[in-house]
Amino acid sequence: MSPLKRRQFTQLAAAGLTSTIVADISSKALAQNNDQNNGKSEEVLYGINLPSTSNALNREDQTPPVELSTADAKTGKVVSKTNVPVQSVDNPSSVRKKSRAFFTGDSDRITKLTALGDGNLVIPIVSNTRDGYFNRLIYTVGSAKNPQFRAKKVLDLETADQTIESLLSLSKDQLLCIVGTEGLPPFTFKTIDSRNGKIISEDDLDLPSLPPAHRFANLCQDPKGNIFATETGSEGVPILISMNLQEKAIVTGKVKIQRLTPLNFEGRPQINDVKDLNFSSSGQLYALAADKSGKKNALFTVDVRSGKMGLVNEDFAVEKFAFSV
C-alpha cells in the first residue's frame, strides 16, 4: 500500500472509530434518559370486575374470583387483564350470623377499589348468604403492577347484616369505611385495622354521624388529604361532599362535613348515584357512572366546584376503578 493510500485508510478508520464512539455515547445517553424517565413512577388506572361465581364457595372464608384490569389513564381504554383466583382469608375467625327464612340465593358484589400509600390495592367484597352477610378484603401484595394476592375477613361488625359499602386508606394500617345495613341506610363511618381485619371500636378520629335516611358512598381522597364522597337524599341526585379530619365542629367536636354541589351532566342533574369516584395524582376527580342508555358504564371527569361531569370513555367496562403508581 502506497504512503498516500495508507494515510487515507488511517483517516477513514479513525473517522469510523470516532463515529462509533459518538454513536455509542449517544445510545448510552438515550438509554440513560429513558431509564431516568422510566424511573419515574407512572400512574396506572386499574379496574375491577366480578365474573360469574360458583355457589360452591365458602363465602365466609373465601373470596370469589375477580378480574383486575389496567387501562390507559387518559382514555380509559382497557389494555390488560389479570384473573385473580379464589382467595382464602388468613384470619378465619367466626363472625356473627343470622339465619334467614326468606332467601333468594347467594350473591357477591364489589363495593370499592382503593389504592394504599405504597401503591398496592384493596378490594372489599360483600357476600349475601343464607347465614347473613360476609365482608372480605382482597389485597395486592408487593406491587399492583405485578401482584400477588391475599385476603382478610372483616371482623367485629356489630350485626350479621352490616356491609362495607366503601373504603379508603387513611394510613398504612388504617382503613376508613362506610358501613350500611344490607347495603341500605342507615350508614355509619367505621375504621378497620388492616393488619387483622378488625373494626376499631374506639373513635379516635371523631367521625361524624350521618343522616339516617340518606345514602353515602364512593369514598375517595385528593392529593391534599381531603376526603370526598357522595350523599344521596330522597330526590335521588347525588351531592358531592367533603371533609378534612383535622377540621372539627366547635359544638360537637366531630369532623365537619361540607356539602359542595350536586353532580350534573350536560346541564342536567345526575339522576341516581355514580358507581365510583377517585382522584388521579394530578388532583383531577373522576367518576364511573351509567351511560345514557343505562346499559354500560362510562368514565367521566368531575369538576369539584361545579359538579359538572365530562365524558372520557363511554364504554369503561369495569365495576370499580382506582389510580395508583
Predicted feature residues:
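Short coil/turn segments that connect the beta-strands within blades of beta-propeller domains
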Residues: 43, 118-119, 172-173, 224-225, ...
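Short loop/turn segments immediately following the C-termini of beta-strands
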Residues: 50-52, 125-128, 180-182, 232-234, ...
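Short loop/turn segments immediately following beta-strands, especially the blade-tip
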Residues: 141-146, 194-196, 243-252
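Structural motif
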Residues: 54-69, 130-139, 184-190, 235-243, ...
